[in-house]
Regions:
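Conserved HGGG/HGGXW glycine-rich cap/lid loop of the alpha/beta-hydrolase fold
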Residues: 38-89
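Alpha/beta-hydrolase fold catalytic core
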Residues: 1-51, 76-77, 117
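Short beta-strand/loop motif that positions the catalytic acidic residue
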Residues: 219, 225-227, 231
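Conserved alpha/beta-hydrolase "nucleophile elbow" surrounding the catalytic nucleophile
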Residues: 57-59, 119, 123-128, 228
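Flexible "cap/lid" loop of the alpha/beta hydrolase fold
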Residues: 129-137, 142-173
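Catalytic nucleophile serine of serine hydrolases
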Residues: 83, 125, 149
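Active-site loop/oxyanion-hole signature of alpha/beta-hydrolase fold enzymes
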Residues: 81-122
Length: 233
């Protein structure tokens, strides 16, 4: 039996109501696709005649966190931002198997449903891992690959994982200002939304599989990697 990532049906309902209130204020189109891996929710912006870029968010976030990036890109690109299944968004509430080809197969289904033979992919943290998973499996479908503090290139730092697991056990949350945003102050509205996410669902609590050098050699497209000096991931 599949297990929802949400802590209760009530928490899921409340979280999604708040999330959708944010989305309604954004000048983007939305769509929901049916796939063999459940529903996939996407934001869409920009002219269909423009080059396509698909954005994949990190853990404990969703497509709304790409707002500023979509606003900057939509004048030159046809932008899609997908809520990853098993994360805190409007897509399927069931997490896929990280050790299998499930997430690569899911994204292939999404691109096929959208009629997109080839796209540029951009991923942050967990989303970077998803982008790598797809790009190593289907390099011919990826025009360019952009990774921001991506998982999957090295083991996650043990001290960060220990703090996250301790916070989860104590039903607390990490300080996003200090532990995730590198000390940069985040607006209270965003912090409240992040805390609502952490109160509503169970994030991935195991290290992401690391891609071997042999797998990374399958990347035939141009790759941009951006990371912070003190990045925990």
């Amino acid at each position: 039996m599949k297990t929802s990532v949400y802590k209760s049906a009530q928490k899921k309902e409340h979280f999604r109501a708040v999330y959708n209130s944010f989305l309604h204020a954004m000048p983007f189109q939305t769509c929901t696709l049916e796939t063999p891996y459940g529903e996939t929710f996407l934001l869409e912006a920009g002219e269909p005649s423009n080059p396509v870029v698909l954005l994949l968010h990190g853990s404990c976030t969703n497509s709304a966190f790409w707002f500023n990036d979509i606003m900057a890109l939509m004048g030159s690109y046809h932008v899609f931002a997908a809520d990853i299944p098993g994360e805190a968004g409007n897509s399927s509430e069931f997490r896929l198997n990280l050790e299998s080809a499930d997430y690569a197969d899911w994204l292939l289904c999404v691109l096929d449903a959208l009629g997109l033979p080839r796209v540029s992919l951009a991923g942050n943290s967990l989303g970077g891992w998803m982008a790598l998973k797809f790009a190593t499996a289907h390099p011919a479908r990826v025009e360019k690959l952009m990774l921001f503090a991506s998982g999957g290139l090295a083991p996650i730092r043990a001290d960060f994982l220990e703090r996250a697991q301790a916070a989860e056990a104590a039903e607390e949350s990490l300080s996003f200002d200090e532990d995730v945003a590198g000390g940069e102050h985040l607006p209270q509205e965003i912090l409240d939304f992040i805390n609502l996410i952490l109160e509503s669902y169970d994030p991935i609590s195991v290290p992401l599989p690391v891609f071997s050098p042999g797998m990374l050699r399958k990347l035939t497209m141009p790759v941009l990697y951006v990371a912070g000096e003190a990045d925990d991931l």
